Amino acid sequence: MNPSNPAASAPHSRAPSRFAQFYALTKPRVVQLIVFCALIGMVLAVPHVPTWPEVKLALIACAGIWLVAGAAAAFNCIVEQRIDARMRRTAWRPTAKGELSNPLTLAFSAALCAAGSVILYVWVNPLTMWLTFATFVGYAVVYTVILKPLTPQNIVIGGASGAMPPVLGWAAMTGTVGPEALILFLIIFLWTPPHFWALALYRVEDYRKSGLPMLPVTHGNEFTRLQVFLYTLVLFAACLMPFVFKMSGWLYLVVAVVLSVGFSWHAWRLWRSYSDALARKTFRFSLIHLSVLFAALLLDHYLV
């Protein structure tokens, strides 16, 4: 999932402990959402109430995915250390403040990635390990190092790595990647641009100072607002796919329609008349949209 979430962590009011500094590097709230989406993939991959061995497998897989996701977040902090220091939203991070050295942070990232990869390979399955490692490379290297400073479409192309968690979860439980997992991938992939660009709209000065070619900086406010609205319409259609392809029932469909109408309505208002407050509301609703959508999919799977 994408690290742009400003709620991913919060500045400390006093000098944090060394443990707190390392923990902050993993962007814990972002990782929690990643693991939640992976868990949705795991649950949907099992057509019945999970047995204890399946529950144990899911817990082990969540631990491995959490470690590798945390490693990617820590690596991101190294690459974007100078950029983070120039942005109010990220200037508090331990690497940006110089509280943790780059070699130490790199060693921490490598240790997390290695531990998570071993857990997934030995106790889950090799496919999940390789897919998770590919996601690490996609986010930490392809997105952060190459795409983010190169193109305003960075979040669209790089969003593929952020959309992988349900696929990882599905692979963990089945050893394969089914079409249902790809539908979940598509939903997150299409959700990411309007989610991120809503944030970038009201943080545009931060991104301008950073020198990153984000869409509101390169193409302007009005163009970005239109893109946010258009993406919510395409996302609306994608959110109906679990029902169309028999992955869910009417409970999910009703929730998906309500959430999608709500997201598109926020985006339409933002497109028609801009304010930072509306952009912030749209961003926050996007978080509600994805979390509640997947929770509804989970409830529908077991209760209906």
Swiss-Prot record:
Keyword Transmembrane helix: yes
Pfam families linked to this entry: UbiA
Catalytic activity of the protein: heme b + (2E,6E)-farnesyl diphosphate + H2O = Fe(II)-heme o + diphosphate
PROSITE patterns per the UniProt record, alphabetical: UBIA (PS00943)
The keyword Cell membrane is assigned to this record: yes
Membrane topology of the entry: Multi-pass membrane protein
Highest rank taxon of the organism: Bacteria
Pathway: Porphyrin-containing compound metabolism; heme O biosynthesis; heme O from protoheme: step 1/1
Gene Ontology MF annotations: protoheme IX farnesyltransferase activity
GO cellular component: a single term: plasma membrane
E.C. numbers: 2.5.1.141
Extra facts: Carbon 2 of the heme B porphyrin ring is defined according to the Fischer nomenclature.
Protein name: Protoheme IX farnesyltransferase
